[in-house]
UniProtKB/Swiss-Prot annotation:
The gene is RB1. Interacts with and sequesters the E2F1 transcription factor, thereby inhibiting E2F1 transcription. Interacts with SUV39H1, KMT5B and KMT5C. (Microbial infection) Interacts with, and is inhibited by fowl adenovirus 1 protein GAM-1. One of its GO terms (cellular component) is chromatin. This is Retinoblastoma-associated protein. Tumor suppressor that is a key regulator of the G1/S transition of the cell cycle. The hypophosphorylated form binds transcription regulators of the E2F family, preventing transcription of E2F-responsive genes. Both physically blocks E2Fs transactivating domain and recruits chromatin-modifying enzymes that actively repress transcription. Cyclin and CDK-dependent phosphorylation of RB1 induces its dissociation from E2Fs, thereby activating transcription of E2F responsive genes and triggering entry into S phase. A motif (Bipartite nuclear localization signal) lies at residues 853-869. Phosphorylated in G1, thereby releasing E2F1 which is then able to activate cell growth. Dephosphorylated at the late M phase. Phosphorylation of domain C promotes interaction between the C-terminal domain C and the Pocket domain, and thereby inhibits interactions with heterodimeric E2F/DP transcription factor complexes. It comes from Gallus gallus (Chicken). SUPFAM superfamilies: Cyclin-like. Keywords: Cell cycle, Chromatin regulator, Cytoplasm, DNA-binding, Host-virus interaction, Nucleus, Phosphoprotein, Repressor, Transcription, Transcription regulation, Tumor suppressor.
Amino acid sequence: MPPKPLRRAGAARSQRTSPEGGAGTASPPGGTRLEVGEAEFVALCDALKAPDSVREKAWMTYQSLAAADGASAYNKKKKETWGVCIFIVAIDLDEMTFTFTELLKSLSISVCTFFQFLKEVDVNMDTVSTKVDSTVSRLKKKYDVLLALYHKFERTCGLIYLEQPSSEISAELSSVLVLKNYWITFLLAKGKVLQMEDDLVISFQLLLCVLDYFIKLSPPAMLKEPYKSAVTALTVNGSTRTPRRGQNRNARASKQIDTDTKVIEILCKEHDCNLDEVKNVYFTSFIPFLNSLGVVASNGLPEVDVLSKQYDELYLKNKDIDARLFLDHDETLQPDVIACSQLERTPRKNNPDEEVNHVLPQTPVRAAMNTIQQLMMILNSATDKPSDTLIAYFNNCTVNPEDSILKRVESLGHIFKKKFAEAVGQGCAEIGSQRYQLGVRLYYRVMESMLKSEEERLSVHNFSKLLNDNIFHTSLLACALEIVMATYGRTASQSDGTSAETDLSFPWILNVFDLKAFDFYKVIESFIKVEPSLTRDMIKHLERCEHRIMESLAWQSDSPLFDLIKQSKEREGQTDQPEPTSTLNLPLQHNHTAADLYLSPVRSPKKKASGHPQSGTSNPDAQPSATSQTQKPQKSTSLSLFYKKVFRLAYLRLHTLFFRLLSEHPDLEPLIWTLFQHTLQNESELMRDRHLDQIMMCSMYGICKVKNVDLRFKTIVSAYKELPNTNQETFKRVLIREEQYDSIIVFYNLVFMQKLKTNILQYASNRPPTLSPIPHIPRSPYQFSNSPRRVPAGNNIYISPLKSPYKFSDGFHSPTKMTPRSRILVSIGETFGTSEKFQKINQMVCNSESHVKRSAEPSDAPKPLKRLRFDIEGQDEADGGKHLPQESKFQQKLAEMTSTRTRMQKQKLNDGNDTSANEEK
C-alpha cells in the first residue's frame, strides 16, 4: 500500500461534490516519506474521495502492473494507470465514490482514450474482472448512444431554428438557451423514462417528442420553414403559446395534448420515423414525464437551472457520464481522431458539379430508422390475425389448433409486455405491446409460408401434429419477435449489422417465454428459408443467434440436448456417438425443415417402423427401410443435424485461432482438431454449462504441450480476444465444479486435463489416434448470392446486389477503385446529375460502334437474349459474334449492349408493323 504522506498533498485539489457529499477519507497508514509519484497518487485518491480499501488495493494493482513485462508504457502514463487501477478496484469493491466524468476530468483524458488504455492494461495483465467488463460495456454503449443523439440533435436544431432571428425575439430566448433547455430536458426525460438507456430508437423517438414540445413553445420568428408555418397555424388557432411565468406547467402540458399534430408529423417525415410509434412514446411516456416535473415556465420555457439540478441528482446517482458537457464540447466527451473516422455518416446527395460521388455509410440514427422501415415493408401485407389461408390449414387438421394458437398468442403477449416494461421502463409498456404486435404479424406470415412449403414438399394438407405442438409455436413466435427486437435494438456503435448487446438482446426472448435454446434453434433455418424478404442484417443476426446456441446456450444443464444424447447412447448401446466422424467431410444437407426437427422423436429399439405416414408431416425417423420392415432405429434428426453444425462451427473457430497463433506449425492443426472433435463427441459432459471456445483453447494448449511447442495460455487468450463475437467471460469465468468458477487455466488443470490426460498423451507417442476428417465447410446457407439476378417479364435487365463502396483491406474509409463498369452508375430514386453524363454515355456508345465489326444477323427474327458474360474474353457473346482482339472489355460490353438494343428495337418495329397490318385487315 502507498505510505502515508506527511501532509495531504491533494486535500484542496478538487472542490467537486461527491455523491455522498462528505469529505474524503483518510489516507492509508504508513511511515515512509513519499516520492513525487506516490504523492500524486494520494492526491488523485483525495480528489476522487476514494476510501482506504480502494486506495490500498488500487496501489497493489498498480505495483503488479509496474512489475510486469513492458511496464515502461505505464511509467510514462502513471496518472492514467493509477486512474484505471482506482476505477477497476472501486467497481470490484462496490465503492464508487466518484462519477465516471469526475474520473476523466481528474485524469484530463477523453472517454475513448480511457477505454483504449483500459484495454491495453487488460491485454497485459488480465486484471479486469467480468464485473468491470460489464460496467465498461454499459458505459461504452451509453456514450455511443449519447454521442449519436447529440450529433443528430445539433444537426436537427440547425434545420429548425434561424441562426440570427429577428430583433423582436427576447434575449432570454437565444439559440444557446433554447439548445440548452432542449438537451437537458431530453437527458432528464431519457433518464427517468428509460431504465435501459442504451436503447437508441426509443431515445431518438423521445428526442423528437422534446423537439415537438419546444417547437410549439417557440416564437414563429425563430423558426425556419416548415416549422414556422405549422407553429403560426397553431398560434392563430389559439392552441399554443399560452403559458407565461408563474403559470402551472401541468396545465400547459395538458393543453398541448389535444393540439394539432402537424409539428410531430413534420419531424417524423423528416427523419423517416413511424408516426404512430412516436405518438405512442409521446402520450404514454413523455406526457407523464412532463406532468411529473412540476417546473414553472419562464417565457414559455422551463427554468434551465431547475432542470439541470434535477438532472444532476440523476447523474450523481448513476455515477456515469455527465451528458450536459456535450453542450460545451467538453474534451472528455469528444471522440478521438480514430473514433471519428469510424463514426457512420449520412450519405450526401448527388452533387451535379462533382465528377464522382462516393456514398458514405449512414449515421447510427439514420441506419436504425432504415432498418425499421425495411421491417415495416416486409409486414405491410401481414396482419396480427390468422389469414384465410391459415384458417383453411387449421380446418384441415384432425384437431383444429386455432383456439389454442390464439390463446397462446394472447397469453404470451401479456408476459412480453410485462417483461418489456421491466427491462426498458414502466412507462414503455405500450411500446412493448406495439412491438409484440409486429412480431405476431411476422409469426403468422412465416407460419403460412412454412405450411405452403411443407404442402408442396409432402403433398399433404393435414398438419395436425405440427400445428398442435406448443414448443413449435412458441419457438416460431420467439424467432419472429427476435427479428423485431433486433431491428429496434440497433445500437449506436453497430455499423455492420452484427448484433451489439443490449438488455433486450438474445437470449432475452428465451427467458421471457421460458423457452429452451435447443428448441429455438430448430426453427431458425426454416424461418430464413421461407421468408425471402428478410434483409441481410436480419439473416446475419439469426445466424449469430444460432451460433450462440451451438457455442453455449444449448449446453446448459437443463437443455433437452443432454436428454437426447443420453437416449442416443441407450438406444445404440455404445459410447456417446451422436454423429459419426465419417460424415464430417460430407457436404451439409439443408433439405430438412422445422417440421422434421420438431417431430423427430428418439424411437425405442424395440419398435418397428410403420409404413403409414402420420398426420401432420412426414417423419424422417419413421421412414421404412427399402430392404426390411424392421429397420435399425435412427438417430434423432435434430440431434444429428445439431452435431453436424456444431462440428463445422467448431472447426471454423479453431482454424481462425490456429491461423493467428500456429501458422508455422500446420501439422498441429489436424491433431488439435482431432482432440477437439473427440471431446465434443465422446466427452459431452465437459460442455455442460460451458462454452465451445473453452474446449477449443484447452485442446490447443494440450496438443502444443505434448508436442513441445511453446504456446502459453496467456498468448492464446490474447489472440482469442481479437476474434469476432468473443466475450472475456469465456476465459475469465469457467465452471470448475458446481457453483465454483475460475479462469481457463484452472479449468484446464483441474478438469480438462484430468478427464483427457490419457487421450492427450497418445499424441506424444509413435502411434497417435486416428485423425478426424476435416469438416466440409460450405458457404453459409444464409448468405445472399452476389451474382446478378434477371428480372422476370422478359426484359433484358439484371440486378446485382449493392456493393459496399469501401473495402476493409484498403482501410476503413478507403473507397474502392473505380472501374469501367462502375465509373458511371445510375441509382434509381436519386438525381443522376446533369445531361453531360448522358452525353458521355452516348459518346462512348458511338465511339465503340465505329470500332466494332459485327457479324450479320442470320434472320430478321431476334435471337433469345442470353445473360451477358463479361469476365471471360470472347466467350458467350450475346449475338454469337467475335470481338476484335485489340478491343478492351469495356468496349466489348458497350458493343454487346448496343447489339442487344438494336435487336430489341428491330423486334419492336416488326411487332408494330404486324399490328398495323392486322388493323388494316
